Amino acid sequence: MKKIKPKDGNKTFCMAPWVHTFISPQMERRMCCASREPSMNFKQYIDSSKPANDELKLLPLKEHWNSDHMKSVRKRLMAGEEIPECATCNHKLLNAQVYRQHFNRFYRDGIDEAFEKTNDEGETSMQVASWDYRFSNLCSFSCRMCGPPLSSSWETENKKQGKFEPWMQNCLLYTSDAADE
């Protein structure tokens, strides 16, 4: 397996798949809040496609951490590939400091360890050090980069304007009562 460290010119490497896990209010597990991974359950705030199905499938961390998907992501990132899951950072879609920079700066002392503790199949023995678990979309802000699944304010506004997609009713598991007013 080809391995290129950031200090050797790898511009796409990100520490998130080695140290971080994210769960959305819709209980989708992903690499981080900005990753564009195939949805197991529902459309996410950053997705542009319909949900894969209507059945809720919760993915435990143990199954996710060294899943085929995560191993593939790690291998591709270590090889310096620009992967579609990381389009938000690759193309700076949020017009801000990209999450990749945050993870690589904050966990810079673990980069060599990530390369050492990842085998040729992409499996790692590193443990999660950062959890971003969002159990609700309750939020009084309406940030432009957000949307109804992560902001009850956006949810309320969309309902008022008749822009609330019917399928989203099933995926907003923990919405506020105010959103229904």
Show where each model-derived region lies.
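Canonical Radical SAM [4Fe-4S] cluster-binding loop centered on the CxxxCxxC motif
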Residues: M31-P38, Y133-L173
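Accessory C-terminal segments flanking Radical SAM cores
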Residues: K2-N119, T124-D132, S153
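Conserved small/polar residues in nucleotide/adenosyl-binding loops
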Residues: Y174-A179
